[in-house]
Amino acid sequence: MLSLSLGRAHGGFCDGISRRNMLRLGGTGAMAGLSLPMLLELEAKAASGRGAQAKSVIMIFLEGGPSHIDMWDLKPDAPKEIRGSFDPISTNVPGTQIGNILPKCATITDKFTILRSHSHRDNGHQTGRHWCLTGHKPSFGDGQANSTPFNELYPSIGSMVSRELGHTGDVPPYICVPEPMGPGGPGFFGAKYAPFVIETDPVQPDFQVRDLNLAAGTSRRRFDLRRRLLSGVEQLAEVRTGRGRAASMSTYYEKALELVTSPGARRAFDMNSENPKLRARYGLTSLGQCCLLSRRLVEAGCRFVGISHGSWDTHV
């Protein structure tokens, strides 16, 4: 049987070749143009175990969804009832066009990848967001604002990254700015993998993260005494109410305590220490400053930053 897939067995990716696939190709090497040295080279590459190099993710989630036929996939040859309202422009990648409302993106298209093969058939905002952020098609809810909270079931991509890659640096592994990112909760992973939500817009002149510093009049010694007292109360709660709920509350407290006691976290959130020229390059807007803050958080060790920006809602 002829098979020219060089990914991991059956439906894999291009980062390796399994021994089974190599043997399947071996019998048709001449037909496929693969010599024995080429096959050995492919197998050696697969054995090297070279994995993904990315350490962090910044996801800009455009709430409501601006239309793809206005931005990345204009379909200029489609009937006017289908194609977008804007004209296509050429980019610095030959053969690739995008919407004329993105002129700066057109000059750096070689620096990013446009995926035009992703879609789903759900036109409800709530259910569609759940599908995008969790990878699971909702099987309940009516897509309206009063639907059952979907993030109570499946974990979001941010929680998955947090769980699989773990904690590093002085900041939480999963952070949302400036508000929760749709159904971006931990689902059945539990509170340990919930996002830390900034709840403040970094474009504001007086931007600061709530409760990041010790309360006025509270010394470090007094803070440590309170922390030990809290630990004793938690142990009592575990005995009286069971481990599950107490553990969830403990996770929230620990996240807050880590931020309060971490100089690195305070530095990452200190937007006033940033070079004014760099802030201006990002744009003195909510989205621009959220992107700059996200960069600072990633540099401080955050695994996944979710930026929520919207609401977009195109109806014709």
Predicted regions and their residues:
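Ligand-binding pockets and gating/stacking loops
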Residues: 1-316
